[in-house]
């Protein structure tokens, strides 16, 4: 077994790379888990530095692999809780840390991040398996109590979508939903050759800082509106909301809302609903707006105006 090496530069860097390669060749990477071990100690140092850890922090790491990032985290915080789905990786990490001074400061949870109950943590740091990027992000943002910050490695395009602004080509439902709940900062690009094995795409690291307290909004309602608006983001809202299936769904929601509120007007036609929708869009200057150009405040205003007329999205 190769003992963990304290990350440094020059000869120490090469020694660490050799250790990583040795661990990599002990077993085959599992493609279904999206396993790509981060091997460059300089990138690891930068990620830990940008995490702004405190000595009292509990850090959640997702997909620690053989522990290259884990070891550096353990040097800078009180405790690391590592969630690993691959038993081989978990065993390798356990062996590696057992030979270090940090054995009592690591907790390994064997399981699928998307299925396990998350413990308390202050900071999340992860080289994210790219195929679970979106559900992972929103599971983190839904976690309570709210954590301080997350520094996450994603596929480059996904990272750019997270931070995209109105008018950007990558601006989408993901951008709007993430930025409703958090501040997103792009930290650095990471080339594919910094991993074993190299992924097919470039990567990037972002910082996500959840708003605390979170916005007082029903997220299911919000996402229902945003999902509809971005179904064709370059089409006008007038065009999107005139689609017969959309009108039919919103009319059914409206009737349910009226029934629950004890209101009598539960027999309105789809044509009446269409008129109500168009009036709401027109009165609030949204008729010719396009989702690709609307910011968070625009969507908040639009949702509030729809709610004022009894139009709901769930």
From Swiss-Prot:
It comes from Dictyostelium discoideum. It is found in: Nucleus, Nucleoplasm; Nucleus, Nucleolus. Specifically dimethylates two adjacent adenosines in the loop of a conserved hairpin near the 3'-end of 18S rRNA in the 40S particle. Involved in the pre-rRNA processing steps leading to small-subunit rRNA production independently of its RNA-modifying catalytic activity. Part of the small subunit (SSU) processome, first precursor of the small eukaryotic ribosomal subunit. S-adenosyl-L-methionine binds at residues 36, 38, 63, 84, 112, 127. Part of the small subunit (SSU) processome, composed of more than 70 proteins and the RNA chaperone small nucleolar RNA (snoRNA) U3. This is Probable dimethyladenosine transferase. It holds the Pfam family RrnaAD. One of its GO terms (cellular component) is nucleolus. Belongs to the class I-like SAM-binding methyltransferase superfamily. rRNA adenine N(6)-methyltransferase family. GO terms for biological process: ribosomal small subunit biogenesis; rRNA methylation. It is an enzyme of class 2 (transferase). It comes from the Eukaryota. One of its GO terms (molecular function) is RNA binding. NCBIfam families: ksgA.
């Amino acid at each position: 077994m190769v003992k963990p090496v304290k990350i440094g530069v020059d000869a120490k860097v090469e020694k660490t790379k050799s250790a990583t390669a040795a661990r990599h060749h002990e077993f085959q990477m599992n493609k279904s888990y999206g396993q790509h071990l981060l091997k460059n100690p300089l990138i690891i140092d930068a990620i830990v530095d940008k995490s702004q850890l405190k000595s009292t922090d509990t850090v959640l790491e997702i997909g620690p692999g053989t522990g290259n990032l884990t070891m550096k985290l353990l040097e800078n915080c009180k405790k690391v809780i590592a969630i690993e789905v691959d038993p081989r990786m978990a065993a390798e990490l356990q062996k590696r840390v057992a030979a270090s001074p940090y054995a009592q400061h690591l907790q390994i949870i064997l399981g699928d991040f998307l299925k396990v109950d998350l413990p308390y943590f202050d900071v999340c740091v992860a080289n994210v398996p790219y195929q679970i990027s979106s559900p992972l992000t929103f599971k983190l943002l839904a976690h309570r109590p709210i954590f301080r910050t997350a520094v996450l490695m994603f596929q480059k395009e996904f990272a750019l979508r997270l931070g995209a602004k109105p008018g950007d080509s990558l601006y989408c439902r993901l951008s709007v939903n993430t930025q409703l709940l958090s501040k997103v900062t792009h930290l650095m690009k990471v080339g594919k050759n910094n991993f074993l094995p190299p992924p097919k795409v470039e990567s990037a690291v972002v910082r996500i800082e959840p708003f605390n307290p979170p916005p007082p909004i029903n997220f299911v309602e919000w996402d229902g509106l945003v999902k509809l608006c971005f179904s064709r983001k370059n089409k006008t809202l007038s065009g999107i909301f005139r689609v017969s299936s959309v009108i039919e769904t919103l009319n059914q929601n409206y009737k349910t809302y009226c029934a629950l509120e004890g209101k009598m007007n539960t027999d309105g036609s789809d044509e009446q609903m269409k008129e109500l929708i168009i009036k709401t869009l027109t009165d609030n200057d949204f008729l010719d707006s396009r989702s690709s150009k609307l910011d968070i405040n625009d969507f908040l205003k639009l949702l509030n105006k729809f709610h004022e007329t009894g139009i709901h999205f769930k």
